Amino acid sequence: MLKTARRLLREILKELRPQIQAGMCVVGLEPSCVSVFRDELVNLITDDEDAKRLSAQTFLLTEFLTEKVPDFSIPKLHRKVLVHGHCHQRSVLRFDDEITTLKKLGVDYTVLDSGCCGMAGAFGFERGDHYDVAI
């Protein structure tokens, strides 16, 4: 699986190289996908400067807004919400920017003390017990 991951990541780097070198940001919505570029890419491909650049130029939407557009404004919702933080986001990325965005939304939020469902990444697609639950 790691050999395939390296091959696919090298293909992505080749395709995105002009944008990476131009400093373009990649904004993702799904923490497991973002963590591939931010964490796994630089651990699997250690000899490519563009891999390091892509890692540094990849953001979750809330990170991008908080870091690159700190004065962004959004309509206030004024309601209660429950927040289930994605386990990849909490363990590999960060969750602070979600809180910043929730505050800007004007919501009364409660972050649930919840665990990992185990379905993100390749875990949910491995043959056996995981696969049947994920599909």
Label the predicted regions:
Residues 1-135:
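Iron-sulfur cluster-binding electron-transfer modules in prokaryotic oxidoreductases
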